[in-house]
Amino acid sequence: MLETFRNAWKIEDLRKRLLFTLLILVLFRLGCAIPVPYISAGALTSMFAGGTGDMLEYLNMMSGGALSECTLFALGVQPAINASIIMQLLAVAIPYLENLTKEGEEGQRKMRRITNYVGAGIGLLLSIGYYFIIRNMGALSYTEGFAGIFSAVVIVLAFTAGSQLCTWMGNQIDTKGIGNGISLMIFAGIVARWSSIYTATTNILARAQNGEPFFYIMLPLLVVLALVAVVFVVILTNAERRIPVQYAKRVMGRKMYGGQSSYIPIKVNMTGVMPIIFASTLCSLPGLIFRFINLDAASHPALYAFFSVFNYNSVLYLIVYVLLIVAFNYFYVAIQYNPVDIANQLRKNNGTIPGIRPGKPTSDFITKTLSKITLIGAIFLAIVAGFPIILGNITGTSIQLGGTTLLIVVGVALETGRSLEGYMTARYHKGFLE
C-alpha cells in the first residue's frame, strides 16, 4: 500500500489528484468545527460521552463527532448515503428507475439528480428531528416567540445546507480526486475520532488501579484482539469464491474466438457495512423515540420499561441485532445479485460452468453457491458487529461502534489503494500505446 502511494506521488497527474483529495478532506474537517448559531456549545457532549449505541451515535461516528458538537457538518454525508440506498431499493421495484440505470450516461445523470433531490429531502427531515432533540435537551438559546421561530429556521437550514455541501465535496473528489469521495469523508471522520482510544485506555487503567488487577491483563489482550480483528476483516473483505467458466470456441470468417477460461467472483462480504447500518438503525429506533419524546420513568412506567428492554447493552438488543444483520445481508445480496441474469449472460456468450448444464441448472448452481457464501458473510458481519458489544459489556468500556468503523476503514483503505493502482495501470498502458 505504501509503495503504491510512493509511486503515485511521482506521477504529476496523480499527485494533483491526491493533493486535491487531501484539500477537500481538510475543508471537511474544518467544517466540522464551525458552530451553528443559537445552540449552546458542548451542551450535547455529555449525551454522547458514554456511547449511546443508537442511531445518533452512529450519525456522530459518520460525521467525525460533528453531531455531538452541533456544528455545520453535523449530518455529514448521511443523507446522501440514505438517498443512495433508497434509490437502489426503488430501482428494483419501479420500472422507470430500473430503465434509467440501463440507459447509459444520460440515465445515470438523471438518477444522480433524483438521488440528490432525495438526499436534500432526507437532510431536511433529519435536521428537523435533530432540532427537536436539541430542544428537548435544553441546548437552545431561544425557544419562544419570534426569536424561537427564527432560530429554528436558521438551525434547520444550516444543518441541511451543511449536509448538501458535504455531498458536493464528495462528488468533487469523485471527479477530480482519488477514490470514492463520500467513503473517504466518512473515513476521515472516523480517523478523527481515534483519540477516544486514549480515553478508553485511561478508563481501563483507572479500573486496574482501583483494585481490579484483571484490567492490567485486559489492556494488552485488547491490543492483541484489535490486531487479530484487523487481519480478520482484511482477509474476509478480500475473500471470494471463484466459479470457473469455460467459453466455447467460435469461428467467425477466418478467425477463431473464445476457448478461454474465466471465473465468476462471489465475494464473501458483498454487502459491506449496509446490513449493519440497516440493523443498527432499526434496533436504535426505540431508543431514538425515547430521546425524542423525553419519557419520565415516574409518569410513564410501562412505556419506560418497554423502551428500556431495547437498551444497547441488553441481551435482547444483541439477539435482535444479530438476526437483523443476517436477514438484511440475504436481502441486500438478493437485490444486488441475480443468478438468472448471470446464467442467461453466460448462455448468450457461449460460456458454461464445467460439469453444469446451461440454463436453469446453471442458475440453480449459482443460487446454491451464493446462498452458502451469503451465510458465511452474514456470520462474519454478525461477529464483527456483535463482538464489540459483548466486549464492551465485559470491560465496561464504550467501544460499541468498533466493528462498523473497522469495516469502513479497512474497506475504504483497500478501495482507495485499488483505485490508485487502476490509475497507474491505465497510465502505463496509455504511455506504452503512445
Spell out what each predicted region is.
Residues 1-101, 106-434:
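N-terminal cationic and glycine-rich segments that engage phosphates or anionic surfaces
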